[in-house]
């Protein structure tokens, strides 16, 4: 039982990027996909997908370009995502990159404004 507690502690210490990488590695190792249950649930809902005129409720905020003030943009990215300094720097320098997925319209607008105020070029999809 102590081994399980140790694993929980180690997993809790992972950054978001490290957790995503771990997920990908486990998917490959076990031959499964973490997205499959979501696709099945969406297919079961069925009727919701049949109405194409619905308004978009989830948005993706993409950092298109960091601009000249990279340090300010890195600070904003850290505040928005909770990433560490190195991960935020890598995200900013690797633009275009997704900063936030599944954001509400208001949240996406706030993130876009904050990043643009810091000097970045941002797209909301």
Curated annotation (Swiss-Prot):
Keywords recorded for this protein, A-Z: Ribonucleoprotein, Ribosomal protein
CDD domains: Ribosomal_L7_L12
InterPro entries: Ribosomal_bL12 (IPR000206), Ribosomal_bL12_C (IPR013823), Ribosomal_bL12_C/ClpS-like (IPR014719), Ribosomal_bL12_oligo (IPR008932), Ribosomal_bL12_oligo_N_sf (IPR036235)
GO annotation, biological process: translation
CC annotations in GO: cytosolic large ribosomal subunit
GO molecular function, one term: mRNA binding
Assigned protein family: Belongs to the bacterial ribosomal protein bL12 family.
Role this protein plays: Forms part of the ribosomal stalk which helps the ribosome interact with GTP-bound translation factors. Is thus essential for accurate translation.
PANTHER family: 39S RIBOSOMAL PROTEIN L12, LARGE RIBOSOMAL SUBUNIT PROTEIN BL12M
Quaternary data: Homodimer. Part of the ribosomal stalk of the 50S ribosomal subunit. Forms a multimeric L10(L12)X complex, where L10 forms an elongated spine to which 2 to 4 L12 dimers bind in a sequential fashion. Binds GTP-bound translation factors.
Name of the molecule in the record: Large ribosomal subunit protein bL12
Gene: rplL
């Amino acid at each position: 039982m102590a081994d399980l507690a140790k694993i929980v502690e180690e997993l809790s210490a992972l950054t978001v990027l490290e957790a995503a990488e771990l997920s990908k590695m486990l998917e490959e190792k076990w031959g499964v996909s973490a997205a499959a249950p979501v696709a099945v649930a969406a297919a079961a809902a069925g009727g919701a997908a049949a109405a194409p005129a619905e308004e978009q409720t989830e948005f993706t905020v993409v950092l298109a370009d960091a601009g000249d003030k990279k340090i300010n943009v890195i600070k904003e990215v850290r505040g928005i995502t909770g990433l560490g300094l190195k991960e935020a720097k890598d995200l900013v320098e690797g633009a275009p990159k997704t900063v936030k997925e599944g954001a509400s319209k208001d949240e996406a607008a706030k993130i876009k404004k904050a990043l643009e105020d810091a000097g970045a070029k941002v797209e909301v999809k």
